[in-house]
Amino acid sequence: MEEIPAQEAAGSPRVQFQSLETQSECLSPEPQFVQDTDMEQGLTGDGETREENKLLIPKQKISEEVHSYKVRVGRLKHDITQVPETREVYKSEDRLERLQEILRKFLYLEREFRQITISKETFTSEKNNECHEPEKSFSLDSTIDADQRVLRIQNTDDNDKYDMSFNQNSASGKHEHLNLTEDFQSSECKESLMDLSHLNKWESIPNTEKSYKCDVCGKIFHQSSALTRHQRIHTREKPYKCKECEKSFSQSSSLSRHKRIHTREKPYKCEASDKSCEASDKSCSPSSGIIQHKKIHTRAKSYKCSSCERVFSRSVHLTQHQKIHKEMPCKCTVCGSDFCHTSYLLEHQRVHHEEKAYEYDEYGLAYIKQQGIHFREKPYTCSECGKDFRLNSHLIQHQRIHTGEKAHECNECGKAFSQTSCLIQHHKMHRKEKSYECNEYEGSFSHSSDLILQQEVLTRQKAFDCDVWEKNSSQRAHLVQHQSIHTKENS
């Protein structure tokens, strides 16, 4: 990079500008200014170059950085749109934290890029902007965005330095995103970002180069709170504790999400359709669930059945529907009608008889009696997974799998269980109770399975006796192997 002499011909003052491409003289009425907030003022009055200004960024280097930046932004957009909207993915806090850190890096890269590149269309001259006059004054256009723009102008003919700074306007506190924000304004991408519930935090990232580095793995964060959360991975610290079940978590958000298991709270409610959502009080626990539910209202039905021209929004629903036209494994023995599901067949068979549809046995179980064949019904259905049960108590016990409820608590150690049988079995450990005794030898067991296993061992023992020696074997193969010793001796 060539240095411009500080003095030209006498009587023709020049103004020195720091440019991204090169340090050039302003000889045109429309100069191009480029910001570099990290640089000090360029040249002293006698033309000597300061040490800080020797490292100017070449144009080729900037082009490479811009290209790399665009490629990375494209990859990030692709990764975010490809995130599966299932509960299992969003429960993985490690993947969520990695995705957040990726986006923070790109926002930081965008901010750095904007600090060193300012288009000349951003500036407009209100006063004299020609270069042949010693006193120069420039101003910014009223449409300039909120970032701070600093322009330093030096008069090389005089030792007086004109340091003209153009600061940010009243809206400067708000961090704006140029290309990145516009790219993510599409409904599909923005929905994925908002689903992560951290878009507002990313927009409020301060315009600073301060960073926090992890001493263990070297990972860099832009906020001290993010570093503190990350360090809990190495220390395995879990400061947030649930008062209900005493389970600990490393993040407060995880504890809040866990508390919904005890309170059965479902805060995400669909407002798109009163008929299918609010009328039935349709709500979902994780944010991914409500997004998946909202797609019922917005998704186009693009899967069409070739036989009956019925349209479905999901391919699995179409596949299940096509079984009606192809596979009919359930057949009515009265009229010969075919059905694809057993439930449809049972519903149909009620038409053929005028008798009482339900009969009850001594246990209170309901049956459908038709031509001597008993079809046991399961009238209790789980609203979460659709599984059917014959007794209401079985349904209540099954629903604890979804809610995570452990209603049966041990009085001695405080451990909780979802089933009464598990609690009773646990109590035997404290009492050291062994209620299952063996009749053949003096011994008792706390579990019936242990007793059965011991009895099987005793029945196998001494089942195979040797005729020569008084030796017993529990397996025939051992006896045959032993008897081969006698056959060799006799031979």
Swiss-Prot record:
The zinc fingers classed as C2H2-type run over 212-234, 240-262, 303-325, 330-353, 380-402, 408-430
Q: Relate the protein's function as given in its record.
A: Probable transcription factor.
Q: Which domain of life is it from?
A: Eukaryota
Cellular component, GO, one term: cytoplasm
Which SUPFAM superfamilies does the UniProt record give?
Answer: beta-beta-alpha zinc fingers
Query: Where does it reside?
Result: Nucleus
Q: Where is this cross-link: Glycyl lysine isopeptide (Lys-Gly) (interchain with G-Cter in SUMO2)?
A: 77, 190, 201
Q: Which InterPro entries match?
A: Krueppel_C2H2_ZnFinger, Znf_C2H2_sf, Znf_C2H2_type
UniProt source species: Homo sapiens
Keywords on this record?
DNA-binding, Isopeptide bond, Metal-binding, Nucleus, Phosphoprotein, Repeat, Transcription, Transcription regulation, Ubl conjugation, Zinc, Zinc-finger
Q: What is the lineage of its organism?
A: Eukaryota, Metazoa, Chordata, Craniata, Vertebrata
Member of which family?
Belongs to the krueppel C2H2-type zinc-finger protein family.
Gene from which the chain derives = ZNF655
Compositional bias segments (type: Polar residues): 15-26
The UniProt-reported impact of residue 106 to G is: Abolished interaction with INTS13 component of the integrator complex
This one is known as: Zinc finger protein 655
Gene Ontology molecular function: any one? RNA polymerase II cis-regulatory region sequence-specific DNA binding
Q: Segment Disordered: which positions? A: 1-52
What GO biological process term is on the record, naming one?
negative regulation of G1/S transition of mitotic cell cycle
Subunit details for this protein? Interacts with VAV1 and CDK4. Interacts with INTS13; promoting association with the integrator complex.
Q: Name one Pfam family in it.
A: zf-C2H2
